[in-house]
Amino acid sequence: YKHGRRIALAPLLARLIAARLPPAMGNRVIVPVPLHRRRIWQRGFNQAALLGRQLHQLGHGPLCVDALVRNRPTPPLGGLGKEARARTLSGAITLRPARVGMIADADVILVDDVLTSGATSTACVKALKRGGAASVTIACFSRVLDEALAR
């Protein structure tokens, strides 16, 4: 999807994600995992934001693409173990101060394409909870099951 630049798959992948989400109720906000601006420039798109836009269009809540900020570029996490991924992401993701009002007391759907070790999701959840999110549900279409990540 992302490495093959097959962005036309976003609607299908979002429908797969949407099928597993609880019905939209109350104060729900869709927030994609952020990429650093350099990575967006290199890739040309944020794959999580594309999925988030599709979830929004499917009626799963408003989309806030800029709620989370990747403060500094991080190297690709592929090949790193769980602890190395967590160290790499430490302090790299924060909540944009201007979006605190939208996140406070909201049920956030955090969107990403793949959940590998959970380090990126954990960093995002911490930032959202610090901003007052009532709950955070992680929504992705794929999960890596690799014992090598446990190292």
Model-derived segments and spans:
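Conserved PRPP/pyrophosphate-binding segment of the phosphoribosyltransferase/PRPP-pathway fold
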Residues: 1-110, 117-151
